[in-house]
Amino acid sequence: MSQEKQVFSIDLAGRQLTVETGQLAKQANGAVLVRYGDTAVLSTATASKEAKNVDFFPLTVNYEERLYAVGKIPGGFIKREGRPSEKAILASRLIDRPIRPLFADGFRNEVQVVSIVMSVDQDCSSEMAAMLGSSLALSISDIPFEGPIAGATVGRINGEFVINPTVEQQEQSDIHLVVAGTKDAINMVEAGADQVPEETMLEAIMFGHDEIKRLIAFQEEIVQAVGKEKSEVKLYEVDADLNQAVREMAEKDMHSAIQVHEKHAREDAINEVKKRVIEHYEAQEADADTLGQVNEILYKIVKEEVRRLITVEKIRPDGRKGDEIRPLASEVGILSRTHGSGLFTRGQTQALSICTLGALGDVQILDGLGVEESKRFMHHYNFPSFSVGETRPMRGPGRREIGHGALGERALEPVIPSEKDFPYTVRLVSEVLESNGSTSQASICGSTLAMMDAGVPLKAPVAGIAMGLVKSGEHYTILTDIQGMEDHLGDMDFKVAGTAHGVTALQMDIKIDGLSREILEEALQQAKVGRMHILDHMLSVIAEPRTELSAYAPKIITMTINPDKIRDVIGPSGKQINKIIEETGVKIDIEQDGTVFISSINQEMNDKAKKIIEDIVREVQVGEIYEGKVKRVEKFGAFVELFSGKDGLVHISELALERVGKVEDVVKIGDVITVKVIEIDKQGRVNLSRKVLLKEEQEKEAAKEENKQEQQ
């Protein structure tokens, strides 16, 4: 095919989307430059010529952010991009999930898809441009990809659905949905919503699919014009005779092993069957390739038998019915010194979530390509190896942990009270202590319990549940509360979180070509029933958020000052505010509108800091009377401190009724005297008088004496 530059365009949500091929990255198997508005993303696809000796499909998807895309130079000592941001990792997962199911089973060549964000227009999503670019790079390449796919962002404003909403529209939208799929079916959903009914979410998904069909037709035109012929790749297959022999040896025993209800006992039973078969072939001195094939066949036997039991015999590995939820157990307040804690257990899945409250100055500062500069609500998810009874090096969070943490954050954020109603930064950490499926949803339930225990006034409690699907031809079974084996061997992982009023988050990944509207609708309704059951259980443990915060949580008071006085509170180079912090031990956060947040564990220190700030911003008015301390004495008068940071001068002529020859004859440093403000000059200097008050007192006494004499 021609390597000349070619340009293709389509209108997308009122903005032009352009695809350029044949000019950049021509040594990649496939490469396109996608321009959407002023957003520009270069997407490339490359593949190894030979299959890798692994038992999985080695696909890597990278979404690379470059700060030059928004005209920024990276901060810090090393002026170049470091590890991927959380947003970049989530975008990589977003692109990976819809394209992964569209490679043939048995394809083992290594494939790498890279999207580099080169220019960002905030109203034109770089993630959606990268998703379309990744699909196109694969589709026009010689890599055997069974796409194309496309994605669309859907919002809803005043009841009307909007495709790829602008930043302004997103702020008004109660749905933030990313949907991807082929022209025939949906195969990926990622959504956050403000307690939206299931029926509305389904309509939003189908609305997005209509746009996907149009974008796929556009891609097909490009593939027709510039696409390469797909290379023929030998798919991995096991030897037919070996396959039959292993099945005859293992199928009957595996059928029994799979139906052991307890997870570890079931794994032991399955491993015992595998061990017996492997030892049989090792005794025959089988080579590594043969043993690898034996393992592959044994895996397929387990997968096929689990799926057959579910779809044909309607039996789940642990004996539950299709819509049955595992036993639930919850507890709150199990960690004394934390601000709030919640333990949620569902079968052999257990999550301990901890809520920490901080001042608004504890927000997470964001330095990426987005418009957001900070984040006051965070949810972090940890998955230690002991949760599945394994040993593994303890490293930082991987893509999975970041993805699960973000899903929980998205599910809970709609019910977090506003900064005005609850001026705290909220951080949640979910520690997965046991894992047998649905840990991300357990972390959502545990986090809700932890926040209620901490006294966070949630708009409504949130629960989450993971749904599964096993599909064989036209027959399918939808599973509620899937466990690890059902997730691993099934066709769908569909996570739904929400309140009693509606959905707050959705995430769907599937391993087959796509799902019909009917299956999606049934899964959503079945998930709602399960979610309500879990919510009832959680509310039986703690019915509403505690009315008082933990004794160890910071106390926050709010005050408002004149914005013109902010600089007085801060002082030159922060001298004044640092002095207050040092003196009281509080944290102080000041908004541009003059709102001041003072926080510390000690309420007395909060009040002290508030008094100091009130004194700093306080306006002195002519005619006001103060009781102040003499701070300095000069020949011409005495300087009196009216309140912290504000002095005035009592001229020697205003000290007493009689003539004063020497200031020290009337007052000395440290004396407390009552004075009246008689003038504020053009330079803001305050002139005080003691004499005026003495005269007023003298006149009152004289009037009293006169009245007394008249009465006699």
UniProtKB/Swiss-Prot annotation:
**Ranges for the KH domain?**
554-613
What Gene Ontology biological process does one annotation of this record name? Answer: RNA processing
One MF annotation (Gene Ontology) recorded for this entry:
magnesium ion binding
Please state where this protein is localized.
Cytoplasm
Instruction: Show the Pfam families listed in the entry.
Output: KH_1, PNPase, RNase_PH, RNase_PH_C, S1
Which CDD domains does this one have?
KH-I_PNPase, RNase_PH_PNPase_1, RNase_PH_PNPase_2, S1_PNPase
* Reaction(s) catalysed (UniProt annotation): RNA(n+1) + phosphate = RNA(n) + a ribonucleoside 5'-diphosphate
Q: A single GO CC term, please?
A: cytosol
Task: Give the EC number(s) listed in the UniProt record.
Answer: 2.7.7.8
Main location as per UniProt: cytoplasm
Q: Which enzyme type, at the first EC level?
A: transferase
Q: Which cofactor does it need?
A: Mg(2+)
Domain S1 motif, by residue range, is: 623-691
Annotated residues that bind Mg(2+) are located at: 487, 493
Q: Which cysteines are joined by disulfide bonds?
A: none
Q: Which InterPro entries match?
A: ExoRNase_PH_dom1 (IPR001247), ExoRNase_PH_dom2 (IPR015847), ExoRNase_PH_dom2_sf (IPR036345), KH_dom (IPR004087), KH_dom_type_1 (IPR004088), KH_dom_type_1_sf (IPR036612), NA-bd_OB-fold (IPR012340), PNPase (IPR012162)
Which keywords appear in this protein's UniProt record, sorted alphabetically?
Cytoplasm, Magnesium, Metal-binding, Nucleotidyltransferase, RNA-binding, Transferase
Q: Which PANTHER family match?
A: POLYRIBONUCLEOTIDE NUCLEOTIDYLTRANSFERASE, POLYRIBONUCLEOTIDE NUCLEOTIDYLTRANSFERASE 1, MITOCHONDRIAL
**Family to which this protein belongs:** Belongs to the polyribonucleotide nucleotidyltransferase family.
Protein purpose: Involved in mRNA degradation. Catalyzes the phosphorolysis of single-stranded polyribonucleotides processively in the 3'- to 5'-direction.
Query: What is the protein named?
Result: Polyribonucleotide nucleotidyltransferase
Identify the species of origin: Bacillus cereus (strain AH187)
